[in-house]
């Protein structure tokens, strides 16, 4: 069952469908990515308040849409990414956020740690409203989740009474740092 961020057709029978399923996984990742015009957060917990040049969507807005559509809280699972996106060729404005880019690719959490986070060329920042970290340096913007943001999302799922959380993709977190944060 899809969530249409652009407000187009969305299945209107979620409450009927929900009686036949054990759970529905809300894949609250890839909310933004290389298909967009601007570098943005892959999976913001909440919608940033500043002006974004593209559509506004977040984990919270997606969960609320599913609940409004009739999926019971106890059947809804919140998906958390164990990967991020590297946007190259961004301008040094707003630390790369909402800037156009020349190329982009997905990269797993382990690769973000070894290839970017521990390099002095990149500065780690955290967006207070979106609740997620990002890196900026060398005209590169990197959107990802870390242990703190994964923990916040898991706490959000519990506070909302959701069935639980799920991850994509476990092999991107071989040290289980994110998995432990999700469980804790």
List each language-model region with its residue ranges.
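Substrate-binding surface in catalytic domains of secreted glycosidases
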Residues: 1-110
